[in-house]
């Protein structure tokens, strides 16, 4: 590699999913094309120890490498890689160091860049003369003619004027010729594993009616490979204080320090919760980006959470006529959100009871009714309390000033919740049927934020943040909820009953030994939490704003977003004086709801993209138990949130960068590049579980690949020459040859066994099952004989018989025949 020093601004044009056209980079393309022919120095796969360290990156503990270094095997692998690179020149392969690493660690996967083949080998839709295959000597001349025509050089048309720079190809440019052929022309991957650089070139045509310069322009893009260091630097650039945050000892400081309480009335007992958190039981992330440790629900932590979440209720409301105001708010709710003011709901008032009865019948058929309490025998005014162990990501630079307080959950038992859930589920179904189409509540059948035919261009947004939402709800909120439920056809006795045991309640934490009385607050874990919070938010916004002109409104719990052609106006003083709520209208407001940004696609639909500042912190969670299944569960959840990440085009990415800049980075103009880097990291780590596990300090291959269980009694010692013997069992000492690797690459192994071997394999499984059954019978017979000897010794007075032995004798005598004791 030449000694040319890359310009920082030149290299940092990172992470885009399409090409950015920039004429100023043409000189760099010529320099890059000269560098392609030069070998990469420092990471040559030559079988040496230095190449092993750079390619495998082993752990060195006490002078011993993990995984161990086998010079003979490493040399054979390097030779195999070189032969494969020389043989397969017609398809793009992964870097040689990565190939050697996969072979040495027995990591399953393809050596061919299949994604790049799909992207850069367009399907021939012509008359079929692009590639010809000679079946006999008569077609030899046609093959030579086609080969000569394909090798002809095409004169490139250069730009003579200055073309204005565009940020997206979707609006103006259309690709007409995209090439991705060999490693010696368009595509170059250096063997520097930490920071390889890709070079891609594509010709595009300007589809805009430009009278001055309609010529074809060329331009490259330089993409920086995603790495943990780059991802961590991205987070530190956006949130600088997160780089110095480490709360490993915060729990110990809290428990061993003094604590002062400021409660009017609270009940305490001696708690026996152990606050120590064993770090060896959890995966440790490799990135330090502000993630908090798992919170333990000790008495001090619970008191701190109760102080912020339940105590110190604000009292900002004025004196009002409670019943008349509640009826007026409920009437405004019906006229704003429901068709024909909700008359359809009242006509079918018995649907709630009918659906609830059907649910209970279905539930009783497959559930054990033992342990289910009768609701009349349960104190419904008493709620259990617990502390959430997971702390939400912090998106502000305040980690050096205050410690985030964990959220709390107040809930009924499972039996009580199972009694009330069917009623509220049926009631919400009725609300969904009567709800106007421009109002969206993402729950049930509409469980996501992907909306069709909703435009964001030339629209105003209203994004409001309601602070202290749960504990600020008072008697007025309870009354107009009751009126709305009655209007939706909810049974009146249940409505009044539900309202009565929410007036005065008692919270009790059985582990932290803390008890506290509350009034009118939202219970964060009962059957009506999400539905009730959504109704409260909808009713307050409808009463304080005119929603008749809005194009779309989304409500989910305490989150809301209004999209309108006319700038919406919200009376914030009414929230303070009437609803006892602290509200903050974001200025400028962006399409952001439920910690997700809404971005418009080319077809006029909306897709949701998770907040990059929150998701990048979730890549370094500190509460995942050291278990492969737990880590895989977090990976599945991460993939579910990133299901639309690969559908983003350049226009959508640019729009998302502007949204993030308006919401978080008004003083950080460089946040555009960091958002692109974060999106590239999300796309990489959501591809497979192997890449996701690289974010945590794991034990290498043992985390994402488990060896197959080996039977103690093998049928035969002969090894099968199949795909699974070499690539699925990473402990196999025998390594495949070159031809086997070639077959692996081109996919000649359609299955582990051929058709002829299937009967043999079936017979082998039967033999193994018989051997296991025979071994089990032999062990049981031996145990029976041993117990018989103990019984005989006890009868003759030569030994004692314990109670455990007596039980074993009884169980074996019931299992085996008397002839088995002979």
Curated annotation (Swiss-Prot):
CDD domains reported for this sequence: Bromoviridae_RdRp
GO CC list: host cell cytoplasm
SUPFAM superfamilies: DNA/RNA polymerases (SSF56672)
GO biological process assignments: DNA-templated transcription; positive stranded viral RNA replication
E.C. code: 2.7.7.48
Subunit structure: Interacts with replication protein 1a.
Role, per record: RNA-dependent RNA polymerase which replicates the viral genome composed of 3 RNA segments, RNA1, RNA2 and RNA3.
Family: Belongs to the ssRNA positive-strand viruses RNA-directed RNA polymerase family.
Protein name: RNA-directed RNA polymerase 2a
Record lineage: Viruses, Riboviria, Orthornavirae, Kitrinoviricota, Alsuviricetes
